[in-house]
């Protein structure tokens, strides 16, 4: 409705007009006119009264009958006007309320928009504030498939649009250390950094995690030094940036361009307490070892003390250098030098990670710790880095190990390392003056010595082992108790090259009393010998060995020793120059340490929960005794290496001289005439063990010839020489593990079915073991395939497989069975097959009768074919004839004319009968020679038919399959 004036028809009540208007003033106007109208009604009523006698004056007034209906009508009109008056008043009130409500609603919308804008721009910090977090706080966040990772709550105003695009309502942006990854996390799933740093930093020993924790500790130190950084010496230390209330700060000795808000800077300045700092310095002066703990508070106080000294005292103290006659080194630092340096770490430059949904953080943390500890135990030998890096780490963490002993963790030791000052090298002289007990204080901190902190932290040269040995000697004079825990440190690093060699002498002193190398060092084993050798323990000492004897003994020694001598040759030369008194002192220290570890082991056996509060001590004890057991007891259970070597040579000798195996190998090779190189290769392989056996026998004769020259040594070595002889006899009599026993797998296909090719047979059966390539046959006439295996076990495995698989060659009913590849069984099978088939009976009897007529004495030894073929003699002439034998596989019927032409060969072979040995070895090839006649005839016919077939199909599009020929 519009606000224009609404006029109602005016009515005349007496002499007055009543006008209703729609505006606000119409209300009062109507009230005044209504009062005037009522007063007029009263006067009318008074005028229409009677006189004193009760008579009504009708002359000048209207009669009573006329005035009453008029009076009722006027009352009705008044009632209607009042009703309309209230309606108009209500309408005007609603209009006014509407006018008032519109600006109120608009103001409410503006307030809501402001609230939403504040929520988007930074009011999500209100949710973080409810959990006690602010922008810039350091936290631990749980990333999927990762342990709790250190990070800090990052201001999203500094993030790129791609990072802000994936933000979630009510979540905070967390930038992680190490890999510079980031993610949006619910504040309820974050935990503060400082209260949980001791627990969370020991989750795993991964290099990436250790790097992240190290960067987090670096940030903690920088924030501690931030409160003592000012613009007195460098006016560019605090530079405002585009974001309001934030500054780019360059803290000395730390990376440049660290972004902090004014609130963080003020908080860092307020956290510095001069009283507490002075008390900490006094406590360190009175009890340095008690003060030098690995807690986070102690680390922050040390950084604050160093920052206070840097802020108060001169930056370059010339008097200090003059007093100690040190060379003056000035850094040519300009006032604008920090502007030229770039920050080493770029936040949010990594990948986006997603948070892991946590049900119960406390129980989950406990489970994570148990899981990670077991995983760390499982992969403990594999978690070390290169040898050069481990040498640096060993030198840096040595002094912190004397306070935490075996309770320390490698990740915690690494994260507390103080990084080298960048571009401000003279300040390291100032720090060594007051605080000498730093977490990674090295020999460079000693006054008068050259500082080597930066060299230790950055030098990756492998030749650093000798330098670390010198530093260890220097530290032993300052901290005598420190060497007690050095063997345990070496145990943690025994997988690396340099550290395992550096501590090998101390470990072997404790295990067997043997040094690694050196002049005049005892060579014989003490603990690793068997029980038979221990009886000759009291024999007189050995004289100095000659060069040949020393080399032969090294060859008889274990492979592990040879490997250790070859790998640690350079280190042995360096260790030979160490003083003998220092070796004896190290031996005493190692023995004391061993007693302590032994007591811990006894306590652990009595109380299984011993060391449950500190898993690292339990790991060190267990690892030490594992290595001790492997060095002392493990190799004494097995046979001596010399016996093993001689037994292997005995196996080779038996395999070379066994007659039946050699005979079988020669009989089963069918294609040696066609491939002479294969025959030569087999000959060289067969006679190689003979040469090695000859060499072994020559060494044995040399040692036996040297026996009169060294009676004392032979007397001590009697058990060693006796045991290999016994083992060798046993090895000769007993069967070898893998004896070459050629076995043939025969597959009989139904007639008319397609047969697999030789390549297919090799591919199908090559997986089961080594095949005899020359024994693989495919016979199309008889529908038989043969596959030869060198070992019977492989053939049996293949038979089990093909018997269980019905679809190896399709849906074909194939019969499988094994056959021994012996000449007797092969010839017997051929004769049986020929006897079964009536077509081949006559061709077989004719050549046999002819042989009986021409050479009757030769038929008698034919009964002994089995025994002769099993044990052929050493005569090579017979072997050559055996090589040229071929079997008949096609089983084609034979004809006598061709066999008659070959009969002179058999008569010539039967000529040297007077010599019994030659006759025995020449007789067996007679029967295969007859088979050779049959094969030649069949091959001639086959070649003739092939020639005709090829001539017939020349120029045609197709060809006839081979089996139809």
Swiss-Prot record:
GO BP terms, alphabetized: regulation of DNA-templated transcription
Q: Which UniProt keywords apply?
A: Nucleus, Transcription, Transcription regulation
- Annotated SMART domains: PWWP
Q: Name one Pfam family in it.
A: PWWP
Record's keyword annotation contains Nucleus: yes
> What CDD domains does UniProt report for this protein, alphabetically?
PWWP
- Effects seen without this gene: No visible flowering phenotype.
Its biological purpose is as follows: May influence gene expression by regulating the function of the PRC2 complex and modulating H3K27me3 level.
Name the record gives this protein: PWWP domain-containing protein 4
| Protein's organism | Arabidopsis thaliana
Its lineage opens with: Eukaryota, Viridiplantae, Streptophyta, Embryophyta, Tracheophyta
